[in-house]
Amino acid sequence: MGNYYSRRKSRKHITTVALIILLLLLFLFLYAKASSSSPNIHHHSTHGSLKKSGNLDPKLHDLDSNAASSRGSKYTNYEGGGEDVFEDGKRRVFTGPNPLHNR
C-alpha cells in the first residue's frame, strides 16, 4: 500500500508543477504582448480615426454661429454692444441641460 500513496503523491506533484509552469508561461506571454504593443497604442490613437461632431449629429451641423449671434444668444455680451465672447477661431460649445443632474 505504500507504493500507491507514493505514486499518487508524485502524480499530484507533477500536475502541480505543470500547472505552475503553464501559468508562468501564460503570464510571460501576456506581459510580452502588452509591453510590445504599448508604443503602438499611442501611435494608433492619433491616427485620425475620430470623426467630427458635425458628422455625428445632423442638428449640430445645421446650426450657424452667425445666425445665433445676430438674434442674441448666451454667447454674446449684451453690455458691450453685442460683441462675441468667443472668437471665430475657437470651437463652438453647445450647452444645455445636463442629463446627469436629472434626478
Swiss-Prot record:
Signal sequence coordinates: 1-34
Tree of life domain: Eukaryota
One term of GO molecular function: receptor serine/threonine kinase binding
Keywords: Developmental protein, Differentiation, Glycoprotein, Hydroxylation, Secreted, Signal
Positions carrying Hydroxyproline: 97
InterPro entries referenced in this protein's UniProt entry, alphabetically: CLE_plant (IPR033249)
Residues glycosylated per entry: 97
Biased segments, Basic residues type: 41-50
Keyword Secreted: yes
GO biological process, one term: maintenance of root meristem identity
Protein's recorded name: CLAVATA3/ESR (CLE)-related protein 22
Bias type Polar residues, positions: 66-76
UniProt keyword Nucleotidyltransferase present: no
Ranges that cross the membrane: none
Family assignment from sequence similarity: Belongs to the CLV3/ESR signal peptide family.
Cystine pairings recorded for this chain: none
Region spans: Disordered: 37-103
GO cellular component, one term: apoplast
